[in-house]
C-alpha cells in the first residue's frame, strides 16, 4: 500500500508532486480551502470538525482576513495546523484505499476500535503524531485481512 504525497496533495486540493513538495507547501502554509476540503470529506455533517485542527478564534480571524483580502498570508494554516491536517488527510487516503468507499472509511474512523483501547481512530490521529502509525498499522492489517 502506498500513501504517497500525491494522494494526500490531491485530497488537500494542492499541487505538490511527492512528499518533499508537500512538506514545503505545509511549511509555507496550506490554504484554508485545504482545511475545508478535507473536513468536507472526512466529516461533512459536523460543522465544528475544523476546530479540531484550528482554534475557533484563529480560524475566524483567518477567514475574515482572507475574505477581506487584506493579508492573503493570514488566510493560510500555520505549519503545525497544516501538519495536523496533512496527517489526517494521509490516514483518510489510506482508509479510503482499504475500505474502498467513503462511508465505510468514515465508520472506521469514527467508531471505537478495540486495538486502540476503545478510542476512535479519528481521535488517535488528531490528538498526537504518535497515533498516526497506530491507525495506519490497523489499516494495513485490515488490508491484508490480519486485523481483529
Predicted segments with their positions:
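Non-transmembrane "mature" sequence context
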Residues: 1-148
Amino acid at each position: 500500500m502506498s500513501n504517497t504525497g500525491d494522494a494526500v496533495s490531491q485530497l488537500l486540493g494542492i499541487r505538490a508532486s511527492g512528499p518533499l513538495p508537500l512538506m514545503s507547501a505545509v511549511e509555507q502554509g496550506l490554504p484554508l480551502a485545504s482545511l475545508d476540503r478535507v473536513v468536507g470529506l472526512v466529516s461533512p455533517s459536523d460543522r465544528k470538525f475544523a476546530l479540531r485542527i484550528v482554534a475557533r478564534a484563529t480560524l475566524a480571524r483567518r477567514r475574515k482576513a482572507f475574505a477581506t483580502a487584506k493579508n492573503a498570508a493570514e488566510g493560510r494554516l500555520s505549519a503545525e495546523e497544516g501538519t495536523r491536517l496533512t496527517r489526517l488527510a494521509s490516514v483518510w487516503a489510506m482508509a479510503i484505499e482499504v475500505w474502498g468507499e467513503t462511508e465505510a472509511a468514515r465508520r472506521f474512523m469514527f467508531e471505537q476500535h478495540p486495538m486502540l483501547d476503545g478510542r476512535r481512530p479519528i481521535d488517535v490521529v488528531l490528538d498526537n503524531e504518535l497515533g498516526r502509525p497506530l491507525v495506519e498499522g490497523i489499516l494495513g492489517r485490515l488490508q491484508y485481512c490480519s486485523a481483529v
